């Protein structure tokens, strides 16, 4: 009944208007699973490879026809007739077929599309929601959203060097209340920025990209919006940063082009510690560059006991890199991006390894997204307690939030909003 009878790949557009891969997996009983693959802007050097065509005459070289051909040809030939319930076997077959350490031959975008679509098809065959199929009966934790309401770095055309300034409504009793809190702060911030003469257009992830001179200026605006919306910063709502420090790490130093400042490794760690002391910041992602291992250790030793330090470019959802980080005391949390590693099996393995080591895990979108809401289900399936999926604008972002609302309603009295328990510093 759950044998794979067809795999159909196609080229669609992501939220930036660039091509990406979408896959349908069709089973013997007629069940269909569909998955669309996201794409990042600030990508780690150690990520699995997203295969692009490179033909400048078509989509400026960003086409994905080669990946789609692999889905319809090589991958279907290898997986046709296989049982969609055998997720590990499906993913392992594709990894072995690709034959490279980074999925660079077939493309992680092709492999991931098939991996996720197969899981969704199997769930559909059982008439089960994906979160229940993947997570079992214990999947009931609704994640705290990290809402990216001010953008800088490569996500915006402004002087702010840090990539994301986020709010976390940890004090809400339910996910629905957390979402309402975030929305009210988002709209209040828009009014405050407008009043101060700033542009209120939104960036790739739906956050505002005002022309502000520094991280402090951005944080001050966010703090003011939280208060004006009727919430308490440091109680109802905490702050989070994504520094994306790899993007401004040059020749061993952190070069803040917007602020016209250069900081050494130690100065970078102390600067972040100072921000944590002055603002209710409970999570910092990529505070150090992906290959600045000494910097990561220094930062973790300095503030790891009071702040979640999330490795994104550092770990790239890769268990080998995560194991090394755990062993050497770098960071205390991992960002989980399905397309960084390229299969559902490897994604779940990274979450499991993190949890066993006492690290937290944050399920995450990419800046180039689609209407696909798979990561919402995966956040609940893994009980990871945190999700990062952009701001309160753009349908590619709200699709994930809306799916979480549906899941919370479906779970009813069994639903549990992670709240402050999601963060070790607040327990």
Curated annotation (Swiss-Prot):
Enzyme class (EC, first level): lyase
PANTHER family: ENOLASE
Name of the protein: Enolase
Residues binding Mg(2+), per UniProt: 242, 285, 312
GO biological process assignments: glycolytic process
Gene: eno
Function (record text): Catalyzes the reversible conversion of 2-phosphoglycerate (2-PG) into phosphoenolpyruvate (PEP). It is essential for the degradation of carbohydrates via glycolysis.
Family to which this protein belongs: Belongs to the enolase family.
GO MF term list: magnesium ion binding; phosphopyruvate hydratase activity
Organism from which the protein derives: Rhodopseudomonas palustris (strain ATCC BAA-98 / CGA009)
